[in-house]
C-alpha cells in the first residue's frame, strides 16, 4: 500500500481517537442528562430503576468509547509504521462509536419525540464515516466490497444488540420497578422472554466485535464468528416479536411517539414494522450474505 494512504489512515485514526476521548464524552453527557432531567422532574425526584439502567449503561459505554479512542491513537502510530494490527484495531475501535451513540441518541424516541438533534448522534456519524474510509483506503475492488458489506451489517446488528441487551433489563424493571418487575417475569411471558433474549443479545454484541477484528485481519475465524453473530441475533430477537408485541416496538409508531409520553395509534407491530423481528431478519440477512460464495471465498482465505 502507498505510504500516502497509510498517512491518511493514520490521520483518520488520530482525529477519530481525539474526538472519542475529548469531545464525545461531553456530547453523551448532554444528551443523557436531557433525558434524565425529564425522568426525574428536572433533577428534583429520586431516580427510578428504568432511568438508572439508562444512566449506567450509557456512561459505561462512554468509558468503552474513550478506551477505544486511546486504541485509535495507537492504531494511528501503527498505520505510520505499516503494522498489520493497525487496521483491525482501528476498525473495531471505530465500531464502538456508531453502535453506542445510536443507543444514547435514540432512547425514549428522543429525536422523534422532540424533533431535535441529539448531540451524541455526532459520534455515530464520525465513527461510521471513518470506519468506511479506512476500509476504502485499505482494500480495492472485490476485496473492498467483500469486507465492506459484512462489516457494515455487523455494525447494524451491533446497534440492535446493544439496545436490546439493555432492554433485557430495562423492560423487566418497567413492570413496577426493580422487585416487582423481577416477580412479573416469572408469570408474564411478555416479560419473561426478556430473561431469554437479553443475555443472548449481550453475547451477540461481544461476538460481533471479535468478528469485526478477525474479518479485518483476514482470519477465517472472522467468517465463522460473523455467522455466529447473525444466527444469535435471529434466535434472540424473533421470539420477542411474538411474545412481546408492544406498540412501542413498531416503526409505524414514530408519529405516535411525537404526540406525548404514551405511544398512541401505533398498533401492534407486524413482521414488517417490528424492530425486534426486523433485527432478527437482519441477522438472517448477514448469514445469507456470508454464505454467498463471493463473500465466503474472500473471507475464508487467510493472508
Regions found by a protein language model. Name each.
Residues 1-303:
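Topology signature of small-to-medium multi-pass alpha-helical membrane proteins
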Amino acid at each position: 500500500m502507498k505510504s500516502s494512504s497509510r498517512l491518511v489512515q493514520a490521520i483518520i485514526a488520530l482525529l477519530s481517537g481525539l474526538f472519542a476521548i475529548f469531545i464525545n464524552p461531553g456530547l453523551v453527557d448532554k444528551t443523557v442528562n436531557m433525558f434524565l432531567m425529564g425522568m426525574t422532574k428536572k433533577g428534583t425526584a429520586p431516580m427510578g430503576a428504568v432511568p438508572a439502567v439508562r444512566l449506567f449503561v450509557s456512561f459505561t459505554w462512554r468509558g468503552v468509547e474513550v478506551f477505544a479512542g486511546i486504541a485509535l491513537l495507537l492504531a494511528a502510530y501503527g498505520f505510520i509504521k505499516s503494522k498489520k494490527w493497525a487496521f483491525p484495531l482501528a476498525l473495531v475501535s471505530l465500531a464502538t462509536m456508531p453502535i453506542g451513540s445510536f443507543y444514547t441518541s435514540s432512547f425514549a424516541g428522543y429525536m422523534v419525540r422532540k424533533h431535535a438533534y441529539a448531540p451524541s448522534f455526532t459520534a455515530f456519524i464520525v465513527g461510521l464515516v471513518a470506519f468506511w474510509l479506512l476500509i476504502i483506503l485499505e482494500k480495492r475492488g472485490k476485496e473492498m466490497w467483500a469486507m465492506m458489506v459484512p462489516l457494515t451489517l455487523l455494525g447494524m446488528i451491533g446497534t440492535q444488540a446493544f439496545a436490546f441487551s439493555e432492554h433485557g433489563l430495562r423492560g423487566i424493571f418497567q413492570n413496577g420497578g426493580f422487585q416487582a418487575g423481577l416477580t412479573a417475569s416469572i408469570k408474564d411471558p411478555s416479560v419473561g422472554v426478556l430473561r431469554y433474549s437479553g443475555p443472548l443479545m449481550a453475547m451477540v454484541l461481544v461476538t460481533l466485535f471479535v468478528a469485526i477484528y478477525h474479518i479485518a485481519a483476514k482470519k477465517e475465524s472472522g467468517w465463522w464468528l460473523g455467522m455466529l453473530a447473525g444466527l444469535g441475533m435471529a434466535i434472540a430477537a424473533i421470539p420477542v416479536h411474538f411474545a412481546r408485541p408492544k406498540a412501542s416496538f413498531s416503526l409505524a409508531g414514530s408519529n405516535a411517539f411525537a404526540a406525548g409520553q404514551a405511544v398512541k395509534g401505533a398498533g401492534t407491530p407486524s413482521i414488517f414494522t417490528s424492530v425486534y423481528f426486523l433485527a432478527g431478519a437482519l441477522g438472517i440477512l448477514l448469514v445469507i450474505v456470508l454464505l454467498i460464495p463471493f463473500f465466503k471465498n474472500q473471507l475464508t482465505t487467510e493472508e
